């Protein structure tokens, strides 16, 4: 995807070398935006192979409101293991905030359900926002949210989604984030009777870790291929009823996988 490769190039040419929480070191830029029109294909990176199984199961896990890594581990997904405690718990991370944001009356707000209902019944609202960045609850999260909040927008029968990501690990994390939120957009569009429009990805601190530079240069040497298509079971009508088997990525022909070490 040209949008992603342009981001890699920008960071390499314009970025500032910075220290970071993990001690690894990064090259970083502040503020970048990518746009993906889903009419042009599903934005799953082709310059290296992505592990789609992990992306799908993680999104379903978020939507269930689950915050324990055991569900992921049972399905062979290990991407959250580094931050889980001995019982698999991760604290009040994404799923908890999406589905059970605490209110001031002792109850909880299901932000996903509210977003679905607002898209259906008040599509011109400018308040269709889901936030994982709960300042009062950051201390209870094993990893504060990198992809912090997202907003939906309805126009001409099309549903679009914009994500703000405060911290973006461009080599390892961002390809997953692009595919995950594009998939969420398709799912939300289906259950609200709309067509999936555009996914807009806005990044805050966009960085390449110093131990990923060789992998990034290898990726930039590869020619992007045609985007695949994501087919979703049309019979699913609730955002909470999707199963792994309801998704099929067709015509995905990526270059080989490129390994990289996760900075913890």
UniProtKB/Swiss-Prot annotation:
Enzyme Commission code: 2.1.1.45
Keywords: Cytoplasm, Methyltransferase, Nucleotide biosynthesis, Transferase
Residues the record lists as binding (6R)-5,10-methylene-5,6,7,8-tetrahydrofolate: 51, 169, 263
Active site: 146 (nucleophile)
Main location: cytoplasm
Catalytic activity: dUMP + (6R)-5,10-methylene-5,6,7,8-tetrahydrofolate = 7,8-dihydrofolate + dTMP
InterPro entries: Thymidate_synth/dCMP_Mease (IPR045097), Thymidate_synth/dCMP_Mease_dom (IPR023451), Thymidate_synth/dCMP_Mease_sf (IPR036926), Thymidylate_synthase (IPR000398), Thymidylate_synthase_AS (IPR020940)
BP-aspect Gene Ontology terms: dTMP biosynthetic process; dTTP biosynthetic process; methylation
Entry keyword annotation includes Metal-binding: no
GO terms for MF: thymidylate synthase activity
Residues bound to dUMP: 21, 126-127, 166-169, 177, 207-209
Pathway(s) of this molecule: Pyrimidine metabolism; dTTP biosynthesis
Entry GO CC: cytosol
NCBIfam families noted in UniProt: PRK01827.1-3, PRK01827.1-5, thym_sym
Task performed by this protein: Catalyzes the reductive methylation of 2'-deoxyuridine-5'-monophosphate (dUMP) to 2'-deoxythymidine-5'-monophosphate (dTMP) while utilizing 5,10-methylenetetrahydrofolate (mTHF) as the methyl donor and reductant in the reaction, yielding dihydrofolate (DHF) as a by-product. This enzymatic reaction provides an intracellular de novo source of dTMP, an essential precursor for DNA biosynthesis.
Subunit structure: Homodimer.
Name the record gives this protein: Thymidylate synthase
Gene source species: Bacteroides thetaiotaomicron (strain ATCC 29148 / DSM 2079 / JCM 5827 / CCUG 10774 / NCTC 10582 / VPI-5482 / E50)
Higher taxonomy: Bacteria, Pseudomonadati, Bacteroidota, Bacteroidia, Bacteroidales
């Amino acid at each position: 995807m040209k949008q992603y490769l342009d981001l890699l190039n920008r960071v390499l040419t314009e970025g500032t070398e910075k220290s970071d929480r993990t001690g690894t070191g990064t090259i970083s830029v502040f503020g970048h935006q990518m746009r993906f029109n889903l009419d042009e294909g599903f934005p799953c990176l082709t310059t290296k192979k992505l592990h789609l199984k992990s992306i799908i199961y993680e999104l379903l896990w978020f939507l269930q409101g689950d915050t324990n890594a055991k569900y992921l581990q049972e399905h062979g997904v290990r991407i959250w293991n580094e931050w889980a405690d001995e019982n698999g718990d991760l604290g009040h991370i994404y799923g908890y905030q999406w589905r059970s944001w605490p209110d001031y009356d002792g109850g909880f707000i299901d932000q996903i359900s509210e977003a679905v209902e607002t898209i259906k019944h008040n599509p011109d609202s400018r308040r269709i926002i889901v936030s994982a960045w709960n300042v009062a609850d950051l201390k209870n999260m094993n990893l504060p949210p990198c992809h912090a909040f997202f907003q939906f927008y309805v126009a001409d029968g099309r549903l679009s989604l914009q994500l703000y990501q405060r911290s973006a690990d461009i080599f390892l994390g961002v390809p997953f984030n692009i595919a995950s939120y594009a998939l969420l957009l398709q799912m939300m569009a289906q259950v609200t009777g709309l067509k999936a429009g555009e996914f807009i990805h806005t990044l805050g601190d966009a960085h390449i870790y110093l131990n990923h530079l060789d992998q990034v240069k290898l990726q930039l040497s590869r020619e992007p291929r045609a985007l695949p298509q994501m087919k979703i079971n049309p019979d699913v009508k609730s955002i909470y009823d999707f199963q792994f088997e309801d998704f099929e990525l067709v015509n995905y022909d990526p270059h080989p996988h490129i390994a990289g070490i996760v900075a913890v």
